[in-house]
From Swiss-Prot:
The keyword Transport does not apply. PROSITE patterns: SH2. This is Signal transducer and activator of transcription 3.1. It comes from Xenopus laevis. CDD domains: SH2_STAT3 (cd10374), STAT3_CCD (cd16853), STAT3_DBD (cd16847). Transcription factor that binds to target promoter sequences and activates transcription upon il6st/gp130 stimulation. Mediates ventralization of embryos, at least in part via inhibition of smad2 signaling. Required for hairy2 to induce dll1/delta1 and promote neural crest cell proliferation and differentiation. Involved in TGFbeta-mediated mesoderm induction in early embryos, acting downstream of map3k7/tak1 and nlk.2. A motif (Essential for nuclear import) lies at residues 150-162.
Length: 769
């Protein structure tokens, strides 16, 4: 199998790393379009030989032209546009340096191979690799590591120069004092001054050399601080910011965030280098106190250099204090950032500067809405107190990887009650599930004479008082983290921004893929788009308001889109997870599409879809049959809800479902799961096998056992549309009488089912129904 095809089948955590490999330098779209050709070329050889690189690059442009022609024939305007843009970019950037693109592609292919090896090793071990995310290093990260190595080398070089200048200064100081004492003695004895003048000239030469070396060191220090500033900006403004954004995405069901260990190593390395430089700057002060002169560069520049390195170190320490694990209730691990009052929640903070001397030295304090103060009262938000163990000392022993961290496991929130029942302002415009609160972590660092105040915040949390508020609270968390990377915008919902369908579709798919093994397909998402936006051809870029997503009722329904979808998600997780993971549930499909795909199938073909009218979440099956005149009929059963699925699994309902005609003959209308999977093959393994054990008499002296029973779902119907079903009817030996008249099954071709407790003789009990 081609390498690219193998990569597409990897778990989500590996696909996230695959995405990080590609950038504008080598777009993933190009990798997708030309996968077989790209894998057939020797890019490593091209990266080392310019003539071959030029040939491969021109062949690449030719392959792009051929692919463009194919898209032209398919009238695929979007792909045509993207491919033309990619070709223009490649020509402008790599036409004069084809070895560079060869090196980039070779590196990507090599990293892909490593990723596949890591995934394969994890599969053989029956679990995830130790750190699968650590296997991929992007080109940008390679450059960052190179910059860090350069910084460390410059620090070492500077230390050597400092030793040289110290030795030179000691020589100068010794010679100067010796000459001074000799000069004093010569004046007393009246000796010749020519020797003294000669030694003075030597001292002047030494002082000139000392001054030049000092100026070189000052210049090197300034240059090194600039390099450190660049690396630090890359670490904090790019790498750490990217990690925080990925953490946001992971919180709302997106791909799992990568490990912090690599970032910790980088930041710790930079912090160590900064402290070394600070010691060198202090050493300059000592040298200045021993020897100084007019125009001394140390006097002029040392204070500014020291101020600069201290500021860099302070900022690095502040940025390195992060929330590694966001607030989450242990009973709801898939819905972090929603906290119920009175229920314990956990979170974890970490300092990415791993200095052993800081172990057990930093005491962390937790508070909520620290910066809000009276502002919260003005906007009507509730106020809370944090109960439980709200202080903890950071240490390296509790973490498996030895990181300097503190985990809070026993925190709870209690609302501060006001005179009007809890809310500071009864005129508040936001409902409680739109209120955002910040949990703050504070500590102080004392290190090498510096005192640094550290503070970090959780992502905004929603606090609920009843679990029934969870769906709307989770919708708020989704909307916030989907649309902003501002970690402190607690007023977000006073004027919530508009999202696009592309953003919403991705997040909706995550709600399934994060808790099951399957996300949503393009067709399923299109059906959801139609529910939200109405009929359309292309929903890409269409705007969706917060109110439409969560607050307004859908057309013709008494509930919002999100309430409906969230209940379906709950239905999937609790009742039909295995069937969803198998891909047996089509789920979201319009009735028009449903009719179109079933009408061409043989009678007995059925599909499973979610109910559009059930607020609490329901699932139904629709099948095709032919009436007595040969006309195709599409029938749907009344949706099954959570309450019904509590008593009987959906697989057993499908396997045992029957239609009863006017002559009391039972027929199974469900034969093939769309497109052509035999019902028994799909659902048989999820049904409980009937006991074959010998039944003992239940009454003393009795020789006959009780009859076994089995629950089945039956739809009574007076029509004769079931005559052409491929499954032959079977008359049961014993059948209970209907309780009342049959339900109306004619409205909307939707059948209502009745559940029967069927008595079976010992003979028929062992045979399938």
């Amino acid at each position: 199998m081609a390498q690219w095809n193998q990569l597409q089948q990897l778990d989500t955590r590996y696909l996230e790393q695959l995405h990080q490999l590609y950038s504008d330098s080598f777009p993933m779209e190009l990798r997708q379009f030309l996968a077989p050709w790209i894998e057939s070329q020797d890019w490593a050889f091209a990266a080392s030989k310019e003539s071959h690189a030029t040939l491969v690059f021109h062949n690449l442009l030719g392959e792009i032209d051929q692919q463009y022609s194919r898209f032209l024939q398919e009238s695929n305007v979007l792909y045509q546009h993207n491919l033309r843009r990619i070709k223009q970019f490649l020509q402008s950037r790599y036409l004069e340096k084809p070895m560079e693109i060869a090196r980039i592609v070779a590196r990507c292919l090599w990293e892909e191979g490593r990723l596949l090896q890591t995934a394969a090793a994890a599969a053989q071990q029956g679990g995830p690799a130790s750190h699968p995310n650590a296997a991929v290093v992007t080109e940008k990260q390679q450059m960052l590591e190179q910059h860090l190595q350069d910084v460390r080398k410059k620090v070492q070089d500077l230390e050597q120069k400092m030793k040289v200048v110290e030795n030179l200064q000691d020589d100068f100081d010794f010679n100067y004092k010796t000459l001074k004492s000799q000069s004093d003695l010569s004046e007393l004895n009246g000796n010749n001054q020519s020797v003294t003048r000669q030694k003075m000239q030597q001292l002047e030469q030494m002082l000139t050399a000392l001054d030049q070396l000092r100026r070189t060191i000052i210049s090197d220090l300034a240059s090194l601080l600039s390099a450190m500033e660049y690396v630090q900006k890359t670490l904090t403004d790019e790498e750490l910011a990217d990690w925080k954004r990925r953490q946001q995405i992971a919180c709302i069901g997106g791909p799992p965030n990568i490990c912090l260990d690599r970032l910790e190593n980088w930041i710790t390395s930079l912090a160590e280098s900064q402290l070394q430089i600070r010691q060198q700057i202090k050493k300059l002060e000592e040298l200045q106190q021993k020897v100084s002169y007019k125009g001394d560069p140390i006097v002029q520049h040392r204070p500014m250099l020291e101020e600069r390195i201290v500021e860099l170190f302070r900022n690095l320490m502040k940025s390195a204090f992060v929330v590694e694990r966001q607030p989450c209730m242990p009973m709801h691990p898939d819905r972090p950032l929603v906290i119920k009052t009175g229920v314990q929640f956990t979170n974890k903070v970490r300092l990415l500067v791993k200095f052993p001397e800081l172990n057990y030295q930093l005491k962390i304090k937790v508070c909520i809405d620290k910066d809000s103060g009276d502002v919260a009262a003005l906007r009507g938000s509730r106020k809370f107190n944090i109960l439980g163990t709200n202080t903890k000392v950071m240490n390296m022993e509790e973490s498996n990887n030895g990181s300097l961290s503190a985990e809070f496991k026993h925190l709870t929130l209690r609302e501060q009650r006001c005179g009007n029942g809890g809310r500071a302002n009864c005129d508040a415009s936001l409902i409680v599930t739109e209120e955002l609160h910040l949990i703050t972590f504070e500590t102080e660092v004392y290190h090498q004479g510096l005192k640094i105040d550290l503070e970090t915040h959780s992502l905004p949390v929603v606090v609920i008082s009843n679990i029934c508020q969870m769906p709307n609270a989770w919708a708020s968390i989704l909307w916030y983290n989907m649309l902003t990377n501002n970690p402190k915008n607690v007023n977000f919902f006073t004027k919530p921004p508009i999202g696009t369908w592309d953003q919403v579709a991705e997040v909706l798919s995550w709600q399934f893929s994060s808790t099951t093994k399957r996300g949503l397909s393009i067709e399923q998402l299109t059906t959801l788009a139609e529910k939200l936006l109405g009929p359309g051809v292309n929903y890409s870029g269409c705007q969706i308001t917060w109110a439409k997503f969560c607050k307004e009722n859908m057309a013709g329904k008494g509930f919002s889109f999100w309430v409906w979808l969230d209940n379906i998600i709950d239905l999937v997780k609790k009742y039909i997870l295995a069937l969803w993971n198998e891909g047996y549930i089509m789920g979201f499909i319009s009735k028009e599409r449903e009719r179109a795909i079933l009408s061409t199938k043989p009678p007995g073909t059925f599909l499973l879809r979610f109910s559009e009218s059930s607020k609490e979440g329901g699932i139904t099956f629709t099948w095709v049959e032919k009436d007595i005149s040969g006309k195709t009929q599409i029938q749907s059963v009344e949706p099954y809800t959570k309450q019904q699925l509590n008593n009987m699994s959906f697989a057993e309902i499908i396997m045992g479902y029957k239609i009863m005609d006017a002559t009391n003959i039972l027929v199974s209308p469900l034969v093939y799961l769309y497109p052509d999977i035999p019902k028994e093959e799909a659902f048989g393994k999820y049904c409980r096998p009937e006991s074959q054990e010998h039944q003992e008499p239940t009454d003393p002296g009795s020789t006959a056992p009780y009859l076994k029973t089995k629950f089945i779902c039956v739809t009574p119907t007076t029509c004769s549309s079931t005559l052409d079903l491929p499954m032959s009817p079977r008359t049961l030996d014993s059948l209970m009488q209907f309780p009342g008249e049959g339900a109306d099954s004619s409205a909307g071709n939707q059948f209502e089912t009745l559940t029967f407790d069927m008595e079976l003789t010992s003979e028929c009990a062992s045979s399938p129904m």
